[in-house]
Amino acid sequence: MKRTFQPSVLKRARNHGFRSRMATVGGRKVLAARRAKGRARLTTV
């Protein structure tokens, strides 16, 4: 049986990266919330 998690740095960046967050209103809210909370990393490394 194939496992469900098949890691890819490129897909990760495209879906969860900074630029994709900034591209939508919801994404910007995510960043704002993480800034307000004081997260060291706003998006995936």
UniProtKB/Swiss-Prot annotation:
The keyword Glycoprotein does not apply. It comes from the Bacteria. GO terms for molecular function: structural constituent of ribosome. Pfam families: Ribosomal_L34. The keyword Transferase does not apply. Keywords: Ribonucleoprotein, Ribosomal protein. GO terms for cellular component: ribonucleoprotein complex; ribosome. One of its GO terms (biological process) is translation. NCBIfam families: rpmH_bact. Belongs to the bacterial ribosomal protein bL34 family. This is Large ribosomal subunit protein bL34. It comes from Tolumonas auensis (strain DSM 9187 / NBRC 110442 / TA 4). The lineage of its organism: Bacteria, Pseudomonadati, Pseudomonadota, Gammaproteobacteria, Aeromonadales.
